[in-house]
Amino acid sequence: AYVPDSDAFSWECLWDKKYAGKILMKDSYRDAYGTAVIYAHAKELEEGTVSVEDLMNDYSPRAMEIAEKYLKAMKPNIAGWEADFGKEMMTKNKAWLNMTWSGDAIWAIEEANAVGVDLDYVVPKEGSNIWYDGWVIPKYAKNPVAASYFINFMCRPDIALRNMDFCGYVSSIATPEILEEKVDTTLDYYADLSYFFGPDADSIQIDKIQYPDRKVVERCAMIRDFGDKTKEVLDIWSRIKGDNLGVGITILIFVVVALMSGWMIYKRWQRYSRRKPVSYTHLR
């Protein structure tokens, strides 16, 4: 294995120089900020003196300073900031670590298995963020009835299952039909899902990526909106990513721009040189 379980089980792996050039990071300032402040306080988290929720939602000047410091220290290890191509890079064995979302991990693992590449997904021991996408009907919607029908349709257990199979992400629907369909008795892994399916679901053989154990969820928290601090966090993110192109690519861009400028000047000169002399007739 390129990455031992012991390494992958801690955010420290993103700062480990032995993985330099083999790490992909989500192009998401929220995820990056949360990851940095969590790892920066790994010792305090282990001691129980701080919580993941407090850390990820701390936008004080000191917290922002720490986040920027740790992200800059991590940056030399990063091969690229990705929004969607990370899962494909992992399946092609071009990256060893990818800070990614669970649904993308499901897709990548399935695709990788088809070509003989073994991937896995873990939530680091220090903790992480819990997030979700949701549908809402805005108050200015022109057809709220149709929107309601759509949401109700997506909440049907049979449709929710089809949607999960397609996108890899878990539906919020927690009916007996969903649980029955997702149980996999071939697995050695048992999860306490009583937080999701109710008290009777405290030892279930099920996919650990889509349905993590209660203990995993308890060390995670939601990132709240940055509010009036959004601009400051985005400024940090811009500074982190700003020179990520590297010297070689930067030089290449300058060369291309110079060549294009030269070509445009040359074409203009050609058009000018082909113009016929103009003769003037003076009337007396």
Q: Whereabouts are the PLM-identified features?
A:
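Structured segments of extracytoplasmic/periplasmic soluble domains
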Residues: 17-18, 39, 74, 89, ...
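Mature extracytoplasmic/periplasmic domains
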Residues: 138-214
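Transmembrane-cytosolic junction motif
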Residues: 269-277
